[in-house]
């Protein structure tokens, strides 16, 4: 019988009512009644054993479905121990009622069949899933030893079965047994509404608690195909969903473990083994009768999840995160020891027993142990246990569909051949939310979870490399065979077996790889000849469904050529022998070049040839060839980057991907790796530059990166095969052009050999310098290097540079065995000259690149003109050696970073905030005394004395004096003083810039209204207004009014009205520029009459005759370029806070937090652009980030920030709005004020007669009363007036709150006629919009 051969049954299929063994076979019976033994609970929680009849549907051999719900107290899960008769149960998987029960059972049945049909299809596509169900259906190996005291050492190996029952015709009781059927998995509806709660709801781990049907034991899975698990994460996290097919697969894996006796804390004799409690001690779970975390770890691979998401061990095992969490973080040693002890204790149960080869392989795959046939026991290696603790226990994926680990925190998981996990991103979640029942999170029946959702597709990686000293797997997926290292030297491998999932100790091209795990079954092809060094070439090819074992004994080394990986990554195989060698870069034909060129976002390295050394060399097809290859790839990548074909981020990511291999090469710790990987700055550079020889290892990973990138960018596998095939075919054709004679001739050419190996070192040195570029020019942290950092970088570069000649000498000595003197002479006279020529050319190229980069940095405003000319001159004069190249890179990098920080932090010498109500000007951030500030313009002191303000007839001015301290060279002193303060003579070249944010309403008249002016002293005590900004004739006017009255002009385009704009005025001696935001508006020139500031300059902002708003006044002691203006505008604009409608908040203005229903409001005051809102009791104000709207939170609800005087508030009722009272048609009145989650703090309510003659205090409330969740506040009369019932019916008048009359609808209800709930339902809010009409 085939795996998962589906029987023709449906929900309506009739139950077996009669059976004649002479004419019928139970093999043809698939729907029948059986009896189940199960645990149940009394009302007081006492347990007992019950037998219940159950209708079973066999959908495939050994796999049964029941549509009747069994309540077992959730099978040991902590839950309500509620007795439910499964015959009358209306709670199948959801709370269904009455007549819908049968239809819902039918849906459940069809849903289960649909899941298994899905599995059936996957069995045709994947041998992993097929073998899994082969284990489930046909390989029933019970792993429990017999009970203590028995003489037999056999392992139970029997089929589990269920009884087939008929109904007694007299008593109508189903008790007549006619036979048994094999049963391995029985799927039943969940015992509660949630099929997965704090643990797997699958029943089977209590000695007397698992169900039995007939003889043997099977596994019961409680499962609902219409349910997807939802994680209870934080409110800011995504809601991850697991596909039901994965959930069922997970539970069936438990069943497989149960059959094999794996990770079961209770043995067949009912005793709890010591290892179960040992594991509990390690994990903090001492309940041996509960499913242990180790069992969950074995069910699927890593049970990792973020530490801040608290979910059960079960969900951890089905959710795959990006960190490992398989050990005790506080005491890793305890974890290793604990796991070693409990695994050893568990496996000792089988000591001395005869076990089958299948069961042996099962145990070895689960625990990484070996079985000794002579002693009949499992050998546990602590080293393997340590690896399992670090990486999480895993099952052989060929048997149990092991989930692959992922690298990022992106809330999706991968599984072989597309089975099982669909975790949806936010945009998909938003589209699906309408299909979920809000209360129970159930998928609607309309959603077909097999077809409606798109799963994440991933190809199986060809092999995994676990780097020595690392605590994570480094996968190299999707690599073609010809780009894998063709030769793998296997050390210390004598006498071991190669089988699937064999772990080999290897050394590949100078990079220490501690383990290689092949992900496919391979067969050994011994047809390839052996070499003179007793090295056997094995061609490993995956054969689907084929298992093999072969011994490799007494071999000094084994050469493994990977020719095929996994389908469809085959057909491209490159084989080299000693008669064929490639000595230069293969030439690509024009068509192929064009293909690469036109491929969008794909970069293919045009590598130099991989050179093969002479036969028997230690480095086979490895170090030298790959090193040259890697160097060329890096060079190509940078060339492509300069052409904008590859982004700098891509290159940086690729470089960072190499770090794990360098950590392994240098035997660095995992902590060092994590630090370097995270920072990607100085540590990254130091790892790259550790030693010159280290560059030999670049080839493997750089090649893998390039191929991975090409694969990832190819839209289809066919496109990838086509693209790659053309390249490989051309490559192989070029190889065929080389003969053995050509190879020998090349081999004998000492100069060529020396030169090629010298180029290797040159390439490495170039790569080192380019790494310096990457680190310093594209530094993600945007921080300048410290002096110590610069010393380290420079010292390391010089160290490598100084070792360069010695490195060349070493290559020369290693390349020749005779006549070292002659070799040295050849090296010094010929090779070294070529090296210097190469370096000279590189300096020339680098200088050009540096100058081009400098020009670009200056044009985009990253560096100032001073720095640009400085480093341009230095580059032209000093750019003569790589050392000085490095010096300039460091200097330029620091300049760029410092310039940005200067603009951001230091350019604003005065930050003025205004409050026109008090007619004051404040200097923010400056106290008395001197503060030193260093920037690109030199060293300055900023001095602020006591602040002085002068007010003159309705306006004020703030005098800013600029003076030069003649006692200090290159220093300028800025002083704030009164008009009568001391005057200083200034240098003739003094310039200035002033900027401010302005909001001007639409002018209501044509009269002149001055906003801003600047005055200079022309003569003795005579001020001349040199610049005026004013509103005139409904337009903004910029003028030099008194100096040149006829030079007034209208700014075009006009300054925007009724919204915030930034005005920047730049005084450049003979001309004045005015900018709006970052655009030039106007220019005033007067070279003959415009004078520099001679003694004193006065800036004036006017607050009369114009209703404008002013903010963030800034003064600069020099001119600001347009690039700087654009930069500061963008930065300043991002710092301001905006209200709900996008208007910028103003200083010292009152605002309301308005609820989403536009009713409840809290008054607050916005103080500064740093968003300090005045405290309101019970209100939590949150600023969500730059350019975000501001919201307040109260009682879990969100409120919008709304200005008090906003025109948008016209339709809302606020404190101070007017209301009119309606007629009251009842007596015995009480006042009900009902608010939804609002804060209410009136001191009193007053009721005024229509005539306005009396003003009586009716109700008095305590101050700051907090009303939550539609609370009701009932007023009572005071001692003077008495209760409100004293008033006559039909009374109307005005309602006042805090002295403000309310003019709108107010409802006063007779509380005696309504309950509190009715009042809440009927009258949601006492203050309503004026156009509301719901008052009865």
From Swiss-Prot:
Residues annotated as binding Zn(2+): 250, 254, 296
Reported cofactor(s): Zn(2+)
Keyword tags: Hydrolase, Metal-binding, Metalloprotease, Protease, Zinc
EC numbers, comma separated: 3.4.24.69
Regulation affecting activity: Inhibited by EDTA and 1,10-phenanthroline.
Catalytic activity of the protein: Limited hydrolysis of proteins of the neuroexocytosis apparatus, synaptobrevins, SNAP25 or syntaxin. No detected action on small molecule substrates
UniProt-listed PROSITE patterns: ZINC_PROTEASE (PS00142)
Gene Ontology molecular function terms on file: metal ion binding; metalloendopeptidase activity
Gene Ontology terms describing biological process: proteolysis
Entry annotation: catalytic residues: 251
InterPro entries: ConA-like_dom_sf, Kunitz_inhibitor_STI-like_sf
Segments of this protein annotated with the region Has protease activity: 1-476
Family: Belongs to the peptidase M27 family.
Function: When overexpressed the N-terminus (residues 1-476) cleaves rat synaptobrevin-2/VAMP2 between '89-Trp-|-Trp-90' in vitro. This releases the cytoplasmic domain of VAMP2 from the synaptic vesicle membrane, which would prevent the assembly of the trans-SNARE complex on the membrane and thus prevent vesicle-target membrane fusion and neurotransmitter release.
Further remark: There are seven antigenically distinct forms of botulinum neurotoxin: Types A, B, C, D, E, F, and G, but serologically this does not belong to any of them.
Name of protein: Putative botulinum-like toxin Wo
Organism, as annotated: Weissella oryzae (strain DSM 25784 / JCM 18191 / LMG 30913 / SG25)
């Amino acid at each position: 019988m085939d795996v998962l051969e589906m029987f023709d049954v449906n929900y309506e299929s009739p139950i077996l009512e009669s059976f004649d063994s002479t004419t019928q076979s139970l093999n043809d019976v698939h729907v029948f009644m059986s009896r189940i033994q199960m645990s149940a609970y009394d009302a007081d929680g006492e347990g007992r054993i019950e037998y219940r009849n159950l209708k079973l549907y066999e959908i495939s051999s050994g796999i049964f479905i029941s549509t009747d719900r069994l309540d077992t107290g959730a099978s040991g899960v902590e839950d309500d121990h509620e007795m439910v008769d499964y015959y009358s149960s209306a709670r199948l998987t959801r709370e269904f009622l009455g007549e819908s029960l049968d239809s819902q059972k039918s849906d459940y049945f069809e849903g289960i069949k649909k899941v298994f049909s899905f599995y059936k299809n996957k069995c045709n596509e994947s041998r992993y899933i097929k073998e899994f169900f082969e284990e489930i259906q046909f390989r029933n190996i019970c792993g429990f030893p017999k009970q203590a005291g028995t003489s037999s050492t056999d392992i139970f190996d029997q089929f589990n079965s269920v009884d087939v029952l008929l109904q007694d015709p007299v008593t109508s009781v189903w008790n007549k047994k006619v036979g048994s059927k094999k049963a391995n998995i029985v799927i039943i509806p969940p015992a509660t509404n949630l099929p997965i709660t704090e643990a797997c709801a699958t029943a089977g781990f209590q000695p007397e608690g698992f169900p039995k049907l007939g003889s043997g034991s099977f596994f019961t899975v409680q499962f609902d195909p219409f349910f997807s698990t939802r994680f209870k994460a934080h409110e800011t996290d995504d809601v991850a969903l697991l596909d039901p097919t994965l959930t069922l697969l997970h539970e069936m894996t438990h069943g497989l473990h149960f059959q094999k006796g794996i990770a079961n804390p209770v043995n067949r004799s009912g005793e709890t083994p010591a290892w179960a409690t040992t594991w509990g001690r390690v994990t903090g779970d001492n309940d041996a009768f509960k499913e242990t975390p180790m069992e969950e770890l074995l069910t699927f691979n890593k049970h990792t999840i973020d530490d801040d998401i608290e979910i059960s061990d079960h969900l951890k095992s089905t959710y795959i995160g990006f960190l490992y969490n398989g050990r005790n973080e506080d005491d890793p040693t305890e974890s290793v020891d604990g796991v070693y002890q409990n695994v050893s204790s568990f496996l000792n149960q089988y000591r001395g027993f005869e076990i089958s080869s299948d069961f042996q392989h099962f145990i070895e795959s689960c625990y990484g142990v070996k079985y000794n046939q002579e002693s009949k026991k499992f050998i546990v290696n602590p080293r393997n246990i340590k690896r399992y603790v670090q990486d999480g226990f895993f099952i052989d994926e060929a048997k149990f569909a092991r989930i692959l680990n992922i690298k990022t925190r992106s809330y999706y998981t991968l599984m072989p051949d597309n089975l099982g996990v669909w975790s949806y991103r936010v945009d998909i979640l938003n589209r699906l939310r309408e299909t979920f029942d809000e209360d129970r999170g159930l998928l609607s029946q309309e959603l077909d979870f097999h077809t409606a959702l798109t799963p994440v597709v991933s190809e199986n990686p060809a092999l995994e490399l676990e780097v020595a000293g690392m605590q994570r797997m480094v996968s190299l997926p999707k690599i073609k065979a010809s780009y894998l290292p063709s030769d793998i030297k296997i050390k210390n491998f004598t006498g071991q077996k190669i089988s699937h999932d064999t772990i080999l100790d290897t050394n590949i091209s100078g990079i220490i790889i501690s383990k290689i795990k092949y992900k496919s079954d391979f067969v050994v092809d011994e047809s390839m000849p052996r070499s003179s060094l007793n090295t056997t070439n094995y061609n490993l090819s995956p054969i689907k469904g084929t298992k093999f074992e072969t011994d490799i004994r007494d071999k000094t080394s084994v050469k493994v050529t990977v020719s095929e990986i996994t389908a469809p990554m085959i057909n491209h195989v490159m084989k080299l022998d000693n008669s064929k060698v490639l000595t230069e870069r293969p030439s690509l034909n024009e068509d192929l070049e064009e293909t690469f060129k036109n491929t969008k976002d794909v970069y293919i390295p045009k590598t130099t040839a991989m050179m093969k050394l002479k036969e028997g060399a230690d480095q086979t097809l490895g170090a030298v060839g790959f090193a040259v290859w890697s160097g060329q790839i890096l060079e190509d990548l940078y060339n492509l980057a300069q052409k904008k074909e590859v982004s700098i981020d891509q290159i940086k990511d690729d470089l960072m991907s190499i770090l794990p291999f360098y950590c392994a090469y240098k035997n660095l710790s995992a902590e060092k790796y994590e630090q370097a990987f995270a920072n990607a700055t100085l540590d990254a550079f130091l790892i790259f530059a550790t030693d010159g020889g280290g560059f030999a290892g670049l080839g493997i990973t750089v090649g893998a990166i390039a191929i991975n990138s090409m694969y990832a960018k190819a839209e289809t596998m066919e496109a990838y095969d086509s693209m790659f095939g053309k390249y490989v075919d051309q490559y192989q054709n070029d190889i065929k052009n080389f003969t053995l004679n050509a190879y020998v001739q090349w081999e004998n050419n000492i100069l060529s050999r020396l030169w090629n190996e010298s180029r290797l070192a040159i390439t490495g040195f170039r790569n080192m310098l380019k790494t310096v570029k990457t680190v310093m020019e594209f530094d993600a942290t945007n921080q300048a290097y410290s002096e110590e950092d610069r010393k380290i970088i420079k010292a390391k570069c010089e160290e490598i540079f100084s070792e360069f000649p010695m490195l060349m000498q070493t290559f020369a000595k290693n390349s020749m065995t005779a006549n070292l003197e002659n070799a040295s002479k050849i090296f010094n006279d010929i090779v070294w000259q070529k090296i210097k020529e190469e370096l000279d050319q590189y300096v020339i190229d680098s200088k050009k690149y540096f100058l081009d980069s400098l020009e670009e940095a200056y044009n985009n405003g990253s560096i100032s003109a001073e720095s640009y000319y400085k480093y341009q001159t230095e580059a032209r004069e000093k750019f003569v050696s790589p050392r000085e190249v490095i010096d300039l890179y460091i200097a330029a990098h620091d300049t760029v970073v410092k310039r940005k920080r200067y603009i951001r932090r230091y350019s604003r010498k005065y930050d003025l905030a205004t409050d026109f109500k008090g007619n004051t000007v404040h200097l923010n951030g400056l106290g008395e005394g001197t503060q030193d500030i260093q920037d690109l313009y030199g060293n300055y002191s900023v001095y602020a004395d006591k602040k002085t303000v002068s007010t003159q007839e309705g306006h004020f001015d703030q005098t800013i004096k600029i003076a030069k301290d003649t006692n200090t060279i290159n220093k300028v002193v800025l002083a704030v003083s009164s008009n009568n303060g001391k005057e200083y003579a200034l240098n003739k070249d003094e310039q200035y810039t002033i900027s401010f944010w302005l909001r001007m309403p639409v002018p209501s008249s044509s009269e002149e209204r001055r906003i801003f002016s600047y005055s200079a002293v022309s003569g003795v005590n005579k001020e001349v207004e040199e610049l005026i900004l004013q509103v005139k004739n409904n337009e903004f006017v910029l003028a030099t009014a008194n100096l040149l009255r006829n030079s007034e002009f209208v700014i075009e385009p006009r300054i925007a009205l009724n919204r915030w704009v930034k005005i920047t005025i730049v005084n450049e001696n003979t001309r004045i520029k005015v900018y709006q935001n970052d655009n030039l508006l106007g220019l005033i020139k007067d070279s003959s009459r415009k004078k520099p500031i001679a003694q004193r300059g006065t800036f004036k902002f006017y607050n009369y005759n114009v209703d404008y708003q002013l903010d963030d006044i800034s003064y600069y002691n020099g001119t600001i370029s347009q690039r700087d203006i654009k930069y500061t505008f963008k930065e300043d604009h991002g710092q301001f806070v905006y209200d709900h409608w996008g208007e910028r908040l103003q200083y010292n203005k009152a605002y309301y937090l308005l609820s989403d229903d536009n009713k409840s409001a809290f008054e607050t005051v916005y103080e500064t652009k740093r968003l300090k809102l005045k405290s309101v009791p019970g209100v939590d104000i949150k600023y969500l980030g730059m350019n975000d709207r501001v919201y307040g939170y109260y009682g879990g609800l969100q409120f919008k920030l709304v200005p008090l005087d906003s025109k948008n508030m016209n339709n809302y009722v606020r404190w101070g709005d007017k209301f009119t009272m309606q007629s009251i048609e009842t007596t015995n009145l009480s006042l009900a004020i009902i608010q939804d989650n609002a804060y209410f703090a009136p001191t009193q309510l007053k009721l005024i007669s229509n005539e306005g003659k009396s003003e009586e205090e009716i109700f008095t409330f305590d101050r700051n009363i907090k009303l939550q969740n539609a609370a009701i506040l009932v007023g009572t009369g005071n001692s003077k007036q008495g209760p409100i019932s004293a008033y006559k019916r039909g009374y109307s008048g005005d309602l006042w709150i805090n002295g403000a009359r309310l003019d709108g609808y107010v409802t006063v209800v007779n509380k005696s006629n309504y309950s509190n709930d009715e009042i809440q339902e009927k009258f949601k809010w006492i203050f309503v919009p004026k156009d509301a009409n719901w008052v009865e």
